[in-house]
């Protein structure tokens, strides 16, 4: 038996399956850790030596359903429960007609 090319054809067991956190096929079944996101660790796996991978899945590459709204509210100091002042142009146009 050789340990090279000819023995690779005999492999038939799955080492990795889908990760429930990142969805990639990098969850090692025997180690029970994900090679891409580090699940089940609480902190997401991220390294500076792979700048391109950081660029692929950082904040802002997805929908940001909640953060989009937070950024907008931050610009005005998280004001709540106030009504906007009526615009002068709208008031003048309605009074002239």
From Swiss-Prot:
Sequence positions bearing N6-acetyllysine: 10
GO cellular component, one term: postsynapse
InterPro entries: Ribosomal_eL37, Ribosomal_eL37/eL43, Ribosomal_eL37_CS, Ribosomal_zn-bd
Pfam families (alphabetical): Ribosomal_L37e
Coiled coil: none
Modified sites of kind Phosphoserine: 96-97
Positions of Zn(2+) binding: 19, 22, 34, 37
Cystine crosslinks: none
GO biological process, one term: positive regulation of signal transduction by p53 class mediator
Top-level lineage group: Eukaryota
Gene3D superfamilies named among the record's database cross-references: 2.20.25.30
Keyword GTP-binding listed: no
Alphabetically ordered keywords of this record: Acetylation, Cytoplasm, Metal-binding, Phosphoprotein, Ribonucleoprotein, Ribosomal protein, RNA-binding, rRNA-binding, Zinc, Zinc-finger
Zinc fingers (C4-type), renumbered ranges: 19-37
Subcellular localization(s) per the UniProt record: Cytoplasm
A molecular-function term among this protein's GO annotations: zinc ion binding
Family: Belongs to the eukaryotic ribosomal protein eL37 family.
PANTHER family given in the database record: 60S RIBOSOMAL PROTEIN L37, LARGE RIBOSOMAL SUBUNIT PROTEIN EL37
Quaternary structure and interacting proteins, as annotated: Component of the large ribosomal subunit.
Function: Component of the large ribosomal subunit. The ribosome is a large ribonucleoprotein complex responsible for the synthesis of proteins in the cell.
The protein's name: Large ribosomal subunit protein eL37
Lineage of origin: Eukaryota, Metazoa, Chordata, Craniata, Vertebrata
Gene that encodes the chain: Rpl37
């Amino acid at each position: 038996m050789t340990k090279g090319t000819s023995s690779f054809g005999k492999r038939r067991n799955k080492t990795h399956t889908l990760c429930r956190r990142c969805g990639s096929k990098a969850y090692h079944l025997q180690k029970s850790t994900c090679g891409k996101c580090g699940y089940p660790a609480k902190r997401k796996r991220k390294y500076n030596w792979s700048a391109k991978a950081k660029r692929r899945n950082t904040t802002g590459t997805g929908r940001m359903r909640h953060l989009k709204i937070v950024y907008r509210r931050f610009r005005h100091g998280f004001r709540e429960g106030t009504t906007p002042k009526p615009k002068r142009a709208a008031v003048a146009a309605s009074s002239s007609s």
